[in-house]
Amino acid sequence: MGKVLAAALIGIAAALAAERLLAFRNRLNATREVDPVALPNCRLIKGIEAGSEDIDILPNGLAFISSGLKYPGLKSLAPDKPGEIFLMDLNEKKPKASELRISRGFDLGSFNPHGISTYIDKDDTVYLFVVNHPHQKSTVELFKFMEEDNSLLHLKTIRHDLLTSVNDVVAVGPDSFYATNDHYFYDFILMFLEMYLGLTWSNVVYYSPKEVKEVAAGFYSANGINISPDKKYIYIADIFDHNVHVMEKHADWNLTHVKTLQLDTLADNLSVDPDTGDIWTGCHPNGMKLFYNDPDNPPASEVLRIQNILAEQPTVTRVYAENGSVLQGTSVATVYNRKLLIGTVYHRALYCEL
């Protein structure tokens, strides 16, 4: 009897493990291959060799680019080099990327930048919020952009018990923001188990010096986050659920769910065109390839443009896609004056004229 029971339990465990593996592969789009969509006027951005995970463009055409992310389980092309923030002026005829100098006193050696967001105050001061992972922790670094000498003045480091595994932020004030925690755990083994078991423990947190609180939960992996031009809605990409959530923002900073747009790809960071309200997102057609790191079968790239997301039937257009021969692991796409920047988790960056 005992042997029969043991065999039954082993069989049940094996069946559950197989079901979880299948679900995990589906969340990663493990069998998808991308059909190419080419853009004619593109070039790789010189100087960006180790990632361009997130990009934020000011209304005047200055683009901030985070580079050098080291993320658990993912490849890094410069594992021993600190992260950097680059600047590009998209008004120039041939824009170039230049590294921004960061003020003394900031720990550059452990700088590991992830998502970024800018905020322009009433006096035109530009603040740059940078998700940082020093020593496998999560902080948000607040900088002031010093345009006269193209540098960043570090103002403060933000830590909080609710900011556990921060992926991205969207600034809503000079010292306040919404942040996505892409996992409950940050340790890679526990993070993998969380993904494998399909736990929906990821969330969104609102932070200000006076109040910190969870404002949305129940995501497989809340990733990119941004805000509508009218500041009424917050957009959240759940990368492993293949969708974008629209949340209404209230006066008390709480969020309520409005709708979910389902996609057939893994949407990473979200950028919003301030003129049209269109959402642009860098996507991973097949997330499994990000983790396998096979040089003969690299992760592909994909860029989507989402128009009229509040409509009953939003328009989703594949603007760019390729098999990884040019760009590997696209994480962001953003536009300014018919110029498109496409960034990656750990690879190069692309500049295109539309």
Swiss-Prot record:
Lineage top rank: taxon: Eukaryota
Protein location: Membrane
Biological processes, Gene Ontology terms: response to toxic substance
Gene3D superfamilies given in the database record: TolB, C-terminal domain
Record-level Gene Ontology MF annotations: aryldialkylphosphatase activity; arylesterase activity; metal ion binding
Binding site for Ca(2+) 1: E53, N167, N223, D268, N269
Cofactor binding note of this UniProt entry: Binds 2 calcium ions per subunit.
Binding site for Ca(2+) 2: D54, I116, D168
Cofactor(s) listed in the protein's UniProt record: Ca(2+)
GO cellular component: extracellular region; membrane
Function: The absence of paraoxonase activity in turkey and chicken blood and in turkey liver indicates that PON2, if expressed, does not hydrolyze paraoxon.
Name of this protein: Serum paraoxonase/arylesterase 2
